[in-house]
């Protein structure tokens, strides 16, 4: 596809998505999903909505995938070709929404505070655009509506079930309240950190607070461990390589005059590389066990890898990033495509990027000119005050579709499904 044709395609898709009827449909989808947020692996209502919309569009799908997920396929009518993937996550967060608006969450203690309602609506919009333009591309587009991104590794289980084994390239997006609507951003190579959780129990010997010499105090041991863990990042890792160790929970005794028998602590570790993740896990175990021993205690450290697979870093394939960037520039203009800094947040899109050439972009949902979604320090992901500018919905739908169509046409002579 020529540069002129690619530019024309992207702008045609964006114009179609911004048409009043289409944009209104996108807003309606997003608001329906927003009012009924569902936590990880509980996305039954959202999954049913996705399937109903796909049925209405005449798009075939497989369900269930990874418990509640849906994987749909739009088949190009221009002939055989490769398979390209687009992915959106569906789950919400255990947060009480504090935003007062007509479509506020109706589910107590649950909120789409990370924009996954936007992601689902945009991908359904892409499905509609792709289905109406099947004669414009070869091959197939797989649309992955994935459960459980928020800490429960839904993407890992989608891959384990083989739902995207035939996909040769994949693309995803995440809302970014720090960018205005109509702007996208990413970077080649490592983009988001890998992440894992840890928990540890330090066991001592309980006793009366008046006679600590008759006890073995696990609180002293856990205090030493917390302080020593900070040295891993401060003194053992390259300051130019992102790494974070955060202790976020400590639970000990209940009485003021009793030294407890044991104390538990837990937290997260993050790194931009696989080697960095392995090193942090090794040293966290050594430090906690070592500080426990120094203080006459014992420790058991658990990274919960069987229940909560660690997230790998999200690393953008250089060629796939360049492809998506070129599509965005032709559709939105170069001024609206930014180079994003690396971030220490984690995304289970990293599982896809480990196996498939992938590109992951941020899409602006902030609004600098007033309106509902003002870009402020209050409007952050995972905040009960999080809001979005719905003008981003058509942009995301068109961007998804354009990235897929242009990839398939550019690689039409490649492997066929």
Curated annotation (Swiss-Prot):
Any single biological process term in GO: auxin metabolic process
Keywords, sorted A to Z: Hydrolase, Signal
Record-linked CDD domains: M20_IAA_Hyd (cd08017)
Enzyme Commission no: 3.5.1.-
Uppermost EC category: hydrolase
Statement: the UniProt record of this protein carries the keyword Mitochondrion: no
Gene3D superfamilies: 3.30.70.360, Zn peptidases
GO molecular function: IAA-Ala conjugate hydrolase activity
Main function: Hydrolyzes certain amino acid conjugates of the plant growth regulator indole-3-acetic acid (IAA).
Entry-linked NCBIfam families: amidohydrolases (TIGR01891)
PANTHER family, per database record: IAA-AMINO ACID HYDROLASE ILR1-LIKE 3, PEPTIDASE M20 FAMILY MEMBER
UniProt family annotation: Belongs to the peptidase M20 family.
Protein's UniProt name: IAA-amino acid hydrolase ILR1-like 3
